Design a protein with these regions (language model features):
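Short, acidic, small-residue-rich periplasmic hinge/interaction motif at the N-terminus
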Residues: 56, 90-94, 105-150, 158, ...
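N-terminal periplasmic accessory domains that precede
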Residues: 112-114, 157-160, 177-182, 194, ...
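Extracytoplasmic beta-strand/coil segments of soluble accessory domains associated
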Residues: 158-199
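Short acidic/polar hinge/loop motifs at secondary-structure boundaries
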Residues: 198-225, 306
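Transmembrane beta-barrel wall of Gram-negative outer-membrane proteins
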Residues: 262-289, 294-329, 342-374, 439, ...
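Membrane-embedded beta-barrel scaffold of Gram-negative outer-membrane proteins
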Residues: 279, 364-382, 463, 522, ...
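Conserved C-terminal beta-signal and adjacent last beta-strands/turns
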Residues: 309-311, 346, 707-822
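Gram-negative outer-membrane beta-barrel transporters
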Residues: 490-497, 602-604, 623-747, 785, ...
Length: 822
């Protein structure tokens, strides 16, 4: 049989084409089976869907897939390869969004909801105030963000905290001096501090911001107002949270910062980070040293941090974090009261660590299981007494030099103050605050307009205090747990609401319930042009705070318990309570370029803790304590009430893409309503505490009198920031100011004759101040930059409480080097 050659080759070509098409189809089918699917939706800050948004999926520097959103904002794109990806999203009229990097493996379906900010405004999201990532435009809470760029030339966070509304920062001394935060007139231990979801404050709320380094701080979020619903006790005035950065670059990147300045100041910092397939990593180490301006007041702080993440798949991630700080400083005391420096030292060690399992199920059910722990140790030593020793009936008393103490209110006192007492030296003391706990939290998105959040948290808190000189060896342990649930949603993308509540079971004070309700609405939605965007806000909430260890261990109940006594009606020290409501308006004056915010708040602090003398406990509370209680001079009780109300204003101006300015002003009206301190009861009895040089003026020697302002809460505070940013050059001027505030010298019966001539009237005793800082950064190359940070340009000496001189003008100059990272 003979075959035509043309037919043979034609048949071969047909079979080849058939096989090729089949093979290509098989490849496509196999690729689709192995593809990473990324889906979600694109919305504006008010939750409205954005159609025709362009979405690009980047792997490294390459665009591996792209697509556009549908009219309802939904999108879905696929990539044939696995690895780490970034979503880049843009749409006409909106700012470009660069999402957080994520891992996607074969067959993974990754859900990523995207929010595009209005043009020229970087989208800001709060998590602290709501528990869920929420655009600031949808939140009714009063929240401010401090970005990592704001901290780029700072060695700490203290001066940036001054640049926030409603916040009063008080630092007793210079670098490393104890720094407290008073928010909206609240107490200094009423701020919950969170590091990667780990409670960082002491048992009972105390936290020293003066030893917190800016190293490994990926910006701070400050929620003003109580949030006991989400964070339990101690979040009675505010919540301050920050996270350790994540590694994001495909190649390892090493960042180094080195600088030096006056007062023998130097700082070195190194950061190593990156991400490879399922793993992301970040580590950091720094040390800061300064001699300060007083003798024997040298300060140093060393910080180390790590953040390691591992993605099991596109929806489940494991993460572990640790942050450790070790610091030491002098204890010079109130130099202006003695004219001589005390010979003391304080050392602090703080370690915060935690681990999480994070899972998203089918895109709308999010679950997190977290273990957290903290270890905080503080040691203080008074090496030897300073001053002149004078013998008396009760031993030696050491007096400082002759000084004139001048108050900001025009009063003054001249003399020698008692600054130390005889005994065995050195005199050490130490305390520890440890915490371990577990938390499970879950949130479910029913629709784009309604979400639910709930959590359960268990904490095991332990504390000890040892002071051999005072024969104190105390310890305490608390096991607490709480439940909370919260609904969050919107109506027609115009009215946004938050409704939640929590039940806490505290070892000391039993069960407490805390509600919360927030509402935000837009009579005029944001847009371009004049006065196009009006947001109204309202919040109501209650908060509770547990006592700190020192007040618990010195409470009447514990003192009786230690003596083996019980008295009817005397129970453990109770919860401190707060009820607050606030309302405000955010008004766009000209689009997103000029914004004005106004807020009014009213706080009622009840059942606050104060020390009450033994005779007053018997007279006013009807409690007679037998003589068998050792060293009983009084005890801590829930007997103090005070109020705080005020207004907060903020103004932001984005003149151009290079120039930005913002400012704010806060007025605070606070008032002590009820107190049983010894000074108050002495005044009630007709024998007020006075200074013989200022007769007729009642003085609160250790706490404020009824009708007066609480100590160290300035009635007027404010700030302004002017910043210029270009491709290679960045400069900023930042200023904070504060009016005079009430305080005490705490020098009752402490002059050379045992009198009160150095105890000055409380009203406006602390000085007001204006602090001006400036920084300049120049980018020489993409890998190398130089900078200068200048602080206290006006050389203000009275930015802290009376008696404690502030660090005068100081500066640091240094360089930043970046290696690797692609």
């Amino acid at each position: 049989m003979f075959y035509d050659s043309g037919q043979i080759f034609a048949g071969i070509r047909t079979q080849v084409r058939t096989c090729a098409l089949g093979g290509f189809a098989a490849i496509l089918f196999t690729s689709s089976l192995n593809a990473v699917v990324v889906r979600g939706d694109v919305r504006d800050p008010l939750g409205r869907p954005i159609g025709l948004a362009k979405i690009q999926l980047l792997q490294g520097h390459l665009v591996v897939a792209s697509g556009t959103s549908n009219e309802d904002g939904s999108y879905e794109i696929r990539s044939a390869g696995s690895g780490r990806f970034v979503l880049l999203t843009g749409a006409a009229g909106y700012a470009t969004n660069v999402a957080q990097p994520f891992y996607g493996g074969d067959l993974d379906v990754v859900t990523n909801h995207l929010t595009l900010g209005f043009r020229a405004v970087e989208e800001q999201v709060t998590v602290t105030a709501t528990g869920l990532p929420t655009p600031m435009e949808q939140s009714s809470a009063s929240v401010n963000l401090i970005s990592s760029a704001d901290l780029a030339t700072r060695e700490g966070v203290v001066n940036e905290l001054r640049l926030q509304p409603g916040v009063s920062v008080v630092q007793t001394g210079q670098n490393g001096g104890q720094t407290s935060l008073f928010v909206r007139g609240g107490t200094s231990d009423g701020n919950k501090v969170m590091v990667d979801g780990i409670p960082a404050d002491d048992v009972g709320g105390r936290f020293d911001f003066g030893i917190l380094s800016s190293t490994a701080v990926n910006g701070l979020e400050i929620h003003r107002g109580p949030d006991s619903v989400l964070y339990g006790s101690d979040a009675i005035s505010s919540v301050v949270s920050f996270n350790i950065p994540h590694g994001v670059t495909p190649a390892p990147v090493l960042n180094y910062t080195g600088d030096a300045g006056n007062f023998h100041t130097y700082r070195n910092e190194a950061e190593l980070s990156g991400a490879y397939r399922k793993i992301d990593y970040y580590t950091a180490f720094s040390r800061f040293d300064s001699s300060n301006a007083l003798p024997m007041d040298r300060f140093h702080v060393t910080t180390a941090a790590a953040n390691l993440g591992y993605s099991l798949n596109g929806s489940t991630q494991l993460r572990g974090t640790v942050r450790r700080g070790v610091s030491a400083s002098g204890l010079p005391g109130a130099f202006d009261f003695a004219g001589i420096v005390a010979a003391g030292k304080q050392a602090d060690e703080q370690t915060f660590f935690g681990g999480t399992i994070d899972n998203i199920y089918r895109g709308n059910w999010h679950n997190v299981l977290r273990y957290f722990g903290s270890r905080k140790d503080e040691q203080a030593t008074n090496f030897f007494p300073v001053g002149e020793a004078v013998s008396g009936a009760f031993g030696d008393t050491y007096y400082g030099n002759t000084v004139t103490i001048r108050g900001a209110n025009g009063t003054s006192g001249t003399g020698r103050a008692a600054i130390a007492f005889g005994g065995t030296y050195p005199q050490p003391s130490d305390s520890a605050n440890n915490r371990d706990g577990m938390q499970y939290q879950t949130d479910y998105h029913f629709t784009p307009h309604l979400s639910a959040y709930g959590s359960f948290r268990y904490e095991d808190e332990r504390g000890t205090y040892h002071n051999p000189a005072n024969f104190l060896d105390q310890s305490a342990r608390r096991r607490n747990y709480d439940y909370n649930v919260q609904l969050q949603g919107d109506v027609l993308n115009r009215v946004f609401f938050t409704l939640g509540g929590a039940i806490q079971k505290n070892y000391l004070y039993g069960t407490e319930a805390t509600p919360r309700f927030g509402l935000a609405g837009y009579p005029v939605r944001p847009g371009s042009g004049w006065f196009h965007g009006t947001k109204l806000r309202f919040n109501f909430s209650k908060g509770v705070q547990e006592p700190n260890l020192s007040t618990q261990l010195s409470s009447l109940y514990v003192l009786l318990q230690q003596a083996g006594l019980t008295i009817p009606g005397v129970s453990p020290i109770g919860a401190q309570r707060l009820r607050t409501y606030e309302g405000g308006v955010d008004q766009s004056i000209y689009g997103s370029k000029l914004m004005l915010k106004f807020n009014y708040f009213h706080n009622e602090f009840g059942r606050q803790i104060e020390f009450v003398g033994s005779s007053d406990i018997q007279q006013y509370f009807g409690i007679s304590v037998p003589s068998g209680v050792a060293n009983y001079f009084g005890a801590y009780l829930n007997s103090l009430d005070f109020s705080a109300q005020g207004i907060e204003t903020e103004l932001e101006w984005r003149a151009s893409r290079h120039f930005f300015a913002r400012g704010g002003y806060t007025y605070l009206d606070s008032n002590v309503q009820k107190s049983f301190s010894s000074d108050v009861t002495a005044e009630l009895g007709g024998f007020p505490t006075t200074n013989p040089n200022y007769p007729g003026i009642a003085i609160g020697s250790s706490s404020p009198l009824v009708g007066q302002r609480p100590f160290r809460r300035a009635p007027q505070t404010g700030y302004f920031v002017v910043q210029y940013t270009a491709t290679k050059f960045t400069a900023a001027v930042k200023s904070a100011f504060s009016s005079r505030s009430d305080d005490s010298t705490f020098l009752s019966f402490s002059d050379f004759n045992g009198g009160n001539t150095l105890l000055l009237p409380n009203r406006n005793l602390d000085f007001g101040y204006q602090n001006i800082d400036a920084n300049v950064t120049y980018q020489i190359t993409s890998k190398f930059s130089v900078f200068t940070q200048m602080n206290n340009l006006l050389g203000q000496q009275h930015m802290g409480p009376i008696g404690y001189p502030s660090l005068p003008f100081n500066f640091r100059t240094g360089l930043k080097v970046r290696l690797g990272g692609g």
